[in-house]
Amino acid sequence: MTVLATEKDSVIVSMGPHHPSMHGVLRLIVTLDGEDVIDCEPILGYLHRGMEKIAENRTIVQYLPYVTRWDYLATMFTEAVTVNAPERLGNIQVPKRASCIRVIMLELSRIAPHLLWLGPFMADIGAQTPFFYISREREIIYDLFEAATGMRMMHNYFRIGGVAVDLPYGWIDKCLDFCDYFLSKVAEYERLITRNPIFLERVEGVGIIGREEAIDWGLSGPMLRASGIQWDLRKVDHYECYDEFDWEVQWQKEGDSLARYLVRIGEMTESIKIIRQALKIIPGGPYENLEARRLDKGKDSEWNDFEFRFISKKPSPTFESPKQEHYVRVEAPKGELGIFLMGDDSIFPWRWKIRPPGFINLQIPPQLVKSMKLADIMTILGSIDIIMGEVDR
């Protein structure tokens, strides 16, 4: 970073790398004039693991366990976009029950990262108590994940054409109980935080991003919706079975850190609304006995190549990517998570390009923090919600 001659009395401070449980291994080189920020340069790459090149040397089925290490707090979304890409290329139909289960898991996986965003964000601006509150609700979500997938994190639950296993007996009732419980806790968060005068003093009018500025920078997710743009890929791309549910896109028009907070709080409420509707319409009810259904169905007169390759065979199945290219995206908690996939009639992808929302959103903080106070850096950075696993890949 070059320092101008007129800034010879300025101070250069290195902030970070931060602990992975907070904002990840991100380093900021900040140029200060007293408490005023003159310049800020983010240093990335500390968590780079070559995820794109690894994908090109694995089959898609072999690569599935790797993708949960991108955004390690919202692993269902990385799995979803990974299986959606070959499903689109191969025109594979997903059963309605599996699609409903996917939606339920995705929305639970949206709430959990928003909770883990809220706790450190409040800690960044000096309020420690909410961190303990969000841990209480987040543990219940992880209990539901563990019961359904066997893992609290890094679930490896999605499969090409569906999910790994059906929901266990009694899981849907437990999930409905959580929905009733969690809404009261969101109201508790709002009573505790939203109208707190000290909180408002720290976030209101801080880190303002205008509508056109958000579009020009390619922002997505809560960063985009907090700037007055009603853009949500669940409404735009019509993936899974989101079109069958009644829910609203959460957005604000102020574009500041408070607006980004309000968008995420609203999204948690909308996620509960989607989960309740999915649990209500899921085919087969609380537990579907697939073995009994298969016996009742009898033998199919036509050869089912998909079932032979993905269900009947004991060895690890393979999926040959057709010689096409496709861009698939999902609405992750942090924004648009996309994959550009190029196939060449091989079991290995020819190109696997990851479009992480955090990497794009992290380009704008240097513009936001200029002329702000040093204490506002953590407010702005916290409101963006950064996970370096997906930024560095």
Curated annotation (Swiss-Prot):
Principal localisation: plastid
One annotated Gene Ontology cellular component of this protein: chloroplast thylakoid membrane
Keyword annotations from UniProtKB, A to Z: Chloroplast, Membrane, NAD, NADP, Plastid, Plastoquinone, Quinone, Thylakoid, Translocase, Transport
Catalytic activity: a plastoquinone + NADH + (n+1) H(+)(in) = a plastoquinol + NAD(+) + n H(+)(out); a plastoquinone + NADPH + (n+1) H(+)(in) = a plastoquinol + NADP(+) + n H(+)(out)
Described function: NDH shuttles electrons from NAD(P)H:plastoquinone, via FMN and iron-sulfur (Fe-S) centers, to quinones in the photosynthetic chain and possibly in a chloroplast respiratory chain. The immediate electron acceptor for the enzyme in this species is believed to be plastoquinone. Couples the redox reaction to proton translocation, and thus conserves the redox energy in a proton gradient.
Record family assignment: Belongs to the complex I 49 kDa subunit family.
Protein name: NAD(P)H-quinone oxidoreductase subunit H, chloroplastic
Species in which this protein is naturally found: Cycas taitungensis
